[in-house]
Structures are given as structure tokens and as C-alpha cells.
């Protein structure tokens, strides 16, 4: 749409120039040239405008700038490629077609019966022996792509952290979200967790511990009581 608007403005400006300079009147030539330049300016300006609605986010893809470092997918310092910063609701200016592509995506919705499983496609490599990135103490910060990739030192790959019910504006080029069912532990039952994340407990007498403390890797000694849980069931296997 933006490129079409730019082309219409260019055609209109050329047509005005042609009409003005075909006139024998000097004043018409000058006036037509000014009008053509004004039309071209307005169409160029309007073609840079993008609107993002309340239930959408805008992914910015930049077509000029430095190359991304090897192995990097998301730009955090103005390199060309998908940008870490997303566009929120409202009008956004100076995003000319040809220089930028804007991909409009719906916000991520997680219902009360669901949990959002997160996989990051960029970031630091997972520590050796880890299949999931550790849970974040501040999950809100984790979802800020710039923070995740810079000072947060987020890890690429499956995340132990999840999206709980709600609406989320996040960079879907960085975070892939798969919706799964929340876990319900009925009354009169408990849930036993086998954790695939966390530190492995120290072996005792040469044997690997089978029952571990909460937060360690293995079968937790502390069960979960009846409740609705929003957990990554790939990272935390629950048996009722």
C-alpha cells in the first residue's frame, strides 16, 4: 500500500510537471512546478506512515545498514534485518517503502485454559547440558527483545518460562509461541514433578539422587497440590 501511494504521487507529480511546462504561460509553468513538488512531497511523506491497531504489533525489517554479526537473526544496533524493537498501537512515521518493510502481526492471546510455550530463535547458546533456558525472575523484561538480547543475556532455544493467560505484545520474529493446555490438578490428588531444568544434585556415595529438592533437576520431593498450573510441561513433567 505504501509503495502504491508513492508511485501514485510520482505519477501525479510528473503529470503536473508535463502539463505546466506545456503551457506557454510562465506563471502557469512556475505554479505547476510548485504544485507538482508539493504533491510529490505530500505523497512521499504519507507513504512513510504506518498504522498499527490496538490488537496488532508491527515487526520492522530494515533493508539498509551494517550486516548482522554471524549467527545473529535479530538486529539490536540498527543493522539491516528484523529489528528487536516492535511498533505498538498508533501511527508511525518515516518508514519509507524500499527502506523498511512492516509486518503486521496479531498480538499473542493466551486464554485462561492455556499456557504459552516460548522458544527464542536468537540469543546466547544454551549452557552445556541444558535443554531449556532457566526461568526468568522478571518475565516481563524477558519479553522485551532488546533487553533479552543485550543486558538480559537471554539464551536461544526453549524457555522454561511461559506465558500465562493474557494478551502480549512481543517480537514474534524472536519469540515463537506454541499454545498448550494448562495443567489442572484435581481435588484429592497431587502432582509429582520431574524437572528437566535446574542444577543436577550432587551424587552421594557414587549414586545419582532420584528424589531432589524443589528447583533441582530430577523428581521433586515436594508434590504439587490441587490447583491450575501454568507450567512448561516439556520442562516439568507432571504425573498425577
Where would I find each of the regions flagged by the language model?
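N-terminal hydrophobic membrane-entry segments
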Residues: 1-240
Amino acid at each position: 500500500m505504501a509503495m502504491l501511494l508513492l508511485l501514485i504521487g510520482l505519477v501525479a507529480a510528473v503529470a503536473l510537471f508535463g502539463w505546466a511546462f506545456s503551457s506557454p504561460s510562465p506563471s502557469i509553468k512556475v505554479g505547476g512546478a510548485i504544485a507538482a513538488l508539493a504533491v510529490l512531497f505530500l505523497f512521499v511523506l504519507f507513504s512513510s506512515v504506518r498504522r498499527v491497531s490496538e490488537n496488532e504489533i508491527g515487526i520492522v525489517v530494515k533493508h539498509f545498514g551494517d550486516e548482522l554479526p554471524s549467527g545473529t537473526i535479530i538486529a539490536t544496533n540498527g543493522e539491516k534485518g528484523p529489528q528487536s524493537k516492535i511498533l505498538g498501537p498508533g501511527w508511525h512515521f518515516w518508514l519509507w517503502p524500499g527502506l523498511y518493510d512492516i509486518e503486521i502481526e496479531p498480538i499473542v492471546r493466551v486464554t485462561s485454559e492455556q499456557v504459552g510455550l516460548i522458544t527464542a530463535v536468537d540469543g546466547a547458546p544454551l549452557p552445556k547440558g541444558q535443554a531449556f533456558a532457566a526461568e526468568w525472575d522478571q518475565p516481563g523484561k524477558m519479553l522485551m527483545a532488546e533487553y533479552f538480547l543485550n543486558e538480559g543475556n537471554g539464551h536461544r532455544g526453549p524457555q522454561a518460562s511461559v506465558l500465562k493467560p493474557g494478551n502480549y505484545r512481543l517480537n514474534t520474529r524472536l519469540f515463537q509461541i506454541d499454545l498448550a493446555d494448562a495443567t489442572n490438578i484435581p481435588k484429592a490428588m497431587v502432582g509429582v514433578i520431574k524437572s528437566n531444568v535446574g542444577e543436577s544434585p550432587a551424587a552421594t556415595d557414587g549414586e545419582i539422587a532420584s528424589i531432589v529438592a524443589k528447583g533441582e533437576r530430577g523428581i521433586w520431593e515436594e508434590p504439587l497440590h490441587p490447583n491450575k498450573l501454568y507450567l512448561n510441561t516439556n520442562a516439568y513433567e507432571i504425573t498425577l
